[in-house]
A protein has these predicted regions:
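Nucleotide-activated sugar donor-binding and catalytic core shared by glycosyltransferases
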Residues: 1-173
């Protein structure tokens, strides 16, 4: 598991997700990456340093290496969604701010479980989705397949063709 909340994580979602996962029956390694601006690093480290399953990193320059090695990603609905998608990493995400709410890519059609706004997320809902994802190999493979089917390599061309098509429809009216 990789927990990756980009930015300063002002809502302390990294700790909330870690604490919630540890309250379940899940007993495998959990990597947590927090950004340079994360202010609760000392509290986070001291709280979980005795747990041999938890590794906490701050200001990591090779985030993509961690994403590549992850079986499941827990993240904010940020640009990391594209990395996860390109690698086919089953992902659960939440919106942590208004900017992320505008990112329409993070949805089930693209193989991503989006739990919506972090402010209104019930821990029970996260636990249910998390355990379902951990325990359901078919679901993870389905998410992986949806993600890998998306052509991110030709993103500019894809967007350009959509814009041209919409423009043609507009002109034809």
């Amino acid at each position: 598991i990789l927990i990756l909340i980009e930015g300063s994580d002002p809502k302390n979602l990294s700790e909330m997700f870690l604490e919630t996962i540890l309250s379940t029956t899940y007993e495998k390694k959990i990597n947590v990456i927090v950004g340079r601006g994360y202010e609760n690093i000392e509290q986070l480290v001291s709280r979980f340093e005795a747990n041999h399953l938890v590794q906490i990193y701050q200001n990591v320059s090779n985030v993509s290496d961690f994403v590549f090695k992850a079986d499941i990603l827990i993240a904010s609905a940020s640009k990391i969604m594209y990395d996860a998608c390109s690698l086919g990493i089953p992902t659960i995400c939440v919106y942590q701010n208004d900017i992320e709410r505008t990112h329409v890519f993070a949805n089930s059609a693209n193989g991503i479980i989006n739990l919506g706004d972090a402010d209104s997320l019930a821990k029970e809902d996260f636990i249910n989705e998390f355990l379902e994802l951990v325990n359901n190999h078919e679901l993870r493979m389905n998410m992986h397949d949806k993600m890998r089917a998306i052509d991110l390599y030709h993103g500019y061309e894809n967007i350009s063709s959509v814009v041209r098509e919409q423009y043609r429809k507009f002109i034809m009216k």
